Swiss-Prot record:
Its EC number is 3.4.23.-. Its main location: cytoplasm. Forms homodimers. Interacts with RAD23. These interactions are mediated by the UBA domain. Is also able to bind ubiquitin and polyubiquitinated proteins. Interacts with the SNAREs SNC1, SNC2, SSO1, TLG1 and TLG2. Binding to SSO1 is promoted by the phosphorylation of 'Ser-49' of SSO1 by TKP1. It is found in: Cytoplasm; Cell membrane. The gene is DDI1. This is DNA damage-inducible protein 1. The keyword Protein transport applies. One of its GO terms (cellular component) is plasma membrane. Induction: By DNA damage via PDR3. Residues 389-428 form the UBA domain.
Amino acid sequence: MDLTISNELTGEIYGPIEVSEDMALTDLIALLQADCGFDKTKHDLYYNMDILDSNRTQSLKELGLKTDDLLLIRGKISNSIQTDAATLSDEAFIEQFRQELLNNQMLRSQLILQIPGLNDLVNDPLLFRERLGPLILQRRYGGYNTAMNPFGIPQDEYTRLMANPDDPDNKKRIAELLDQQAIDEQLRNAIEYTPEMFTQVPMLYINIEINNYPVKAFVDTGAQTTIMSTRLAKKTGLSRMIDKRFIGEARGVGTGKIIGRIHQAQVKIETQYIPCSFTVLDTDIDVLIGLDMLKRHLACVDLKENVLRIAEVETSFLSEAEIPKSFQEGLPAPTSVTTSSDKPLTPTKTSSTLPPQPGAVPALAPRTGMGPTPTGRSTAGATTATGRTFPEQTIKQLMDLGFPRDAVVKALKQTNGNAEFAASLLFQ
């Protein structure tokens, strides 16, 4: 490697001097004593503003020296001056370094290769402190084996906090630093003992078929209803079967507009065909299998075997390589559904001539605790022995499916007023 030596006492520059990177520092000192007028009793050798201990036996490579680096020969500093430098505040230390760069053209020429725009920064004290201050302070404290203070914060701040630890603001700051220490300790332990916690877990997908069209379905036990996208409804030919009377809003982490509902479609999982109803949303994911379908068919999510057991068949969850990356983005998370069927249905031109279909029951908006419907509704209701009132419109819709009024009211009572669950109970 090539090194340049600058003697600031005489103004002379030596080099580049070609030396081996494996040369010991003591050998380099001996070379400088012979050729550059270096005297260990009067001079110090500087590298990157740090004094190199002339008694070290480490190689130049181990000390971090590289080709084209600059070494400075300066006069020894008295102990009192060294003590003053050690007691400088962080801002004063940064300013001292800036002044050193202003007065030392050789050092500035070396650092400008590593710090673009250094000439402009040196001439602006405020910008210099803002841009290079953190790096200079890191260099100042980085040479110690342990942090200058237990919190690893600037020494000025630590001194201020410890000077009056009972001050409310200081006490709050100290508590924050202690909490951060605990968080950092937890992070280190987690990285060391449970690194798998930092890997991304693939979502649960299975292969299904709808109208002979293969689909990768997302299994979500946290979703209340099973969802199909409008795009897939068109591809599978089910868009004409969407009951648009069930327009509403899906609510979860966000909200989504419900286009309607497909009351029944055959879904093939492995060799088994099972009936399924879909809430149709304009979403990016094709199919989301929710809790309604999973509970109806007594599904079991077996994460140990990585399979889904449903309707007496078993299908494997897809591996991460089998899941398109686009599927991982923008997953809908509706957990509750509010439809316009809470209001009396208004027949449309396309639906007025159609008789009610089995299962065509409005999904009422979930209520906290599944409590009774407010009595202030415009439609009359049936009151049970417990004083619970059900909307007359809901009772009529269930009776239109061919069930007597007493059975409808009983089913609504058993399902806490949920019309969809009541219909499922009546059909059993």
